[in-house]
Amino acid sequence: MSNSVPATSTQPEPELAQLPPALTHESPEDDDYHRRFGGVARLYGAAGLARLEAASVCVVGIGGVGSWAAEALARNAVGRVTLIDLDHIAVSNTNRQIHALGDAYGRAKVQAMAERMVQINPRCRVTEVDDFVTPENLVELLDGHDYIIDAIDSVKVKIAMLGWARRVGRRIITCGGAGGQLDPTRIRVVDFSRTVQDPLLAKVRSTLRKDWGWPRNPKRKFGIDAVFSDEPLRYPEPEQQSCEIDEAPQAAPGASAGPQGLACAGFGSSVAVTAVFGMVAASSVLAALTAPDVSTAPE
């Protein structure tokens, strides 16, 4: 299911994937738009702001990492954002997910996040995809966006998304595991071939090299950025329960079971770390979207 929250824009809309028809939320005349985002214009320049307003970004996984990335996109005037997640907000999400409030428990994550985003930026067109990405539907859901933020922990789907994106030349940034870590200053962005201390990304990388023909030479880069932490993992004490499993609705036939957001997966987690993962991913995307076209850059 897909819902969209559009608002007036003078920018031509890019050709996006063929998503289902969407619900429209009309926004009132917004006279203070430039006051809202004047800080963005002063930072990135008028041309940079225009690029952000015209951009389309897809966030896959609206959990402890992806919800914060989506928040950053909205607060930086990105014009079109697609949110993809079939999960619903659970009490156990409260410690790390921005939309996890008392009156939101049980709601679809994409719906709660979309409503929040249009309150921040009434001109943002937010498309809600209440579904999981699978190897079978990823082209339909992801194709046509200017950038994709991978904030999921499904190894199979991560492999399929990254393999497809690299093969067809789609820009994507992938996020590693955010659980079991205390120090947000250890979070880094490097080429995906260079990550360390991240079992999730290591497993994905190994399969991409083995089954997708990605470079095995450690000196060769993949050309895809990854957000990860080089902090050694902190394991829970034996008497501590692992993560609750009340976050996962029954998957649709053919879909991957369980939630796809970067869950703690048995580790403890802190918003002081998970939020920084999302913000770092978003900041990398914003930098790429606002970079001047090399062909038109002054000599």
Regions found by a protein language model. Give the residues of each.
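Internal hydrophobic alpha-helix adjacent to the cofactor/substrate pocket in enzyme cavities
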Residues: 210, 275-293
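Hydrophobic/small residue at the entry helix of a nucleotide-binding pocket
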Residues: 65-66
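Conserved SAM/SAH-binding loop
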Residues: 129-138
